[in-house]
């Protein structure tokens, strides 16, 4: 294609998959309208009132950003930012009607709006930060329950919009031009939709200790939140090894199992934990954020 000065037309463009189809000029406008209507019909019918997105009212300073479910703490001297996402504080609605009544305060909507806001703050206001440490806090069971409700009610237009928003925000995380390190310590809740943060990271460190953290999968890890390439983060991680990407929903992994399954990069024990994480942060922070 690059060597043809005259370009590619018609049937050859279709056969080379450069375009979907060719249409005569006499039918062009009609065919475009038909395709547009067909695509529009794939969206769930919207019934009932919409949802007003209330302001997030985050607190911004030179030291970071503080939201209800997401916080960003800046260590300017070390050129490291700690991004922490928290699980729901209580039980989340289980039906589409109840979710719509909760509106913009629904955890899956508000928390990911806050994550989007923090990622944009990093992009535009923190150019010297080279490393972002991804952390989570809270009860993993509440995250999994929220995921399960979203999945079971996904046919509802509002729930579908929430899932689409989560997908877009996670794509922004994928495309964030900083080194991303997930730190999976005690008290973490990398489960379901929040497990995607660890899967999006360039490196992940999980503490291997008695009573240590665990990872857990939900239905949302299996295709509801794809990357920009159309694949899941698991599918991208195991490109060329599709059988390894077929991890069932509802599985729980300790550090050893997560390392064997390829879900984390490193699993230091308590003796090496502090030093390994510190050295990793110092190594990455020593490199230019622009180069990364």
Language-model region placement:
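Glycine-rich beta-to-alpha active-site loop
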Residues: 1, 6-7, 137, 170-223, ...
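Glycine-rich, flexible loop segments associated with nucleotide phosphate handling
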Residues: 104-111, 213-216, 253
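Glycine-rich phosphate/ribose-binding loops and adjacent secondary-structure elements
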Residues: 181, 222-237
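A structural preference for short, pocket-lining loop segments at secondary-structure junctions
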Residues: 80-83, 108-157, 161-186, 207-212
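Amphipathic alpha-helical segments at domain termini/boundaries
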Residues: 1-103, 121, 125-128, 135, ...
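Conserved aromatic-histidine-acidic binding/catalytic patches
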Residues: 20, 103, 107, 154, ...
């Amino acid at each position: 294609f690059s060597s043809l000065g005259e370009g590619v037309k018609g049937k050859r463009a279709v056969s080379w998959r450069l375009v979907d189809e060719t249409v005569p000029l006499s039918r062009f406008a009609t065919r475009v309208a038909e395709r547009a209507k067909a695509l529009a019909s794939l969206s769930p019918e919207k019934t009932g009132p919409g949802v007003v997105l209330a302001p997030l009212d985050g607190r911004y300073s030179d030291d970071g950003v503080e939201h209800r479910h997401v916080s960003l703490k800046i260590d300017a001297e070390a050129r490291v930012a700690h991004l922490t996402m928290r699980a729901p504080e209580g039980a989340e609605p289980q039906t589409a009607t109840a979710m719509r009544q909760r509106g913009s305060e629904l955890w899956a909507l508000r928390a990911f709006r806050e994550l989007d806001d923090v990622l944009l703050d990093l992009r535009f206001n923190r150019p010297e930060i080279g490393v972002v440490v991804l952390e989570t806090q809270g009860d993993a069971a509440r995250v999994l329950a929220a995921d399960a409700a979203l999945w079971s009610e996904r046919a509802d237009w509002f729930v579908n919009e929430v899932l689409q928003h989560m997908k877009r925000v996670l794509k922004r995380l994928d495309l964030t031009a900083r080194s991303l390190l997930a730190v999976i310590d005690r008290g973490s809740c990398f489960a379901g939709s929040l497990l995607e943060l660890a899967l999006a990271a360039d490196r992940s460190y999980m503490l291997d200790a008695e009573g240590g953290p665990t990872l857990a999968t939900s239905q949302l890890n299996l295709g509801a939140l794809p990357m920009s390439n159309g694949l899941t983060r698991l599918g991208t991680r195991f490109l060329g090894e599709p059988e390894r990407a077929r991890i069932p929903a509802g599985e729980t992994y300790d550090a050893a199992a997560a390392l064997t399954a390829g879900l984390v990069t490193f699993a230091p024990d308590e003796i090496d934990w502090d030093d390994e994480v510190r050295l990793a942060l110092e190594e990455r922070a020593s490199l230019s954020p622009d180069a990364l």
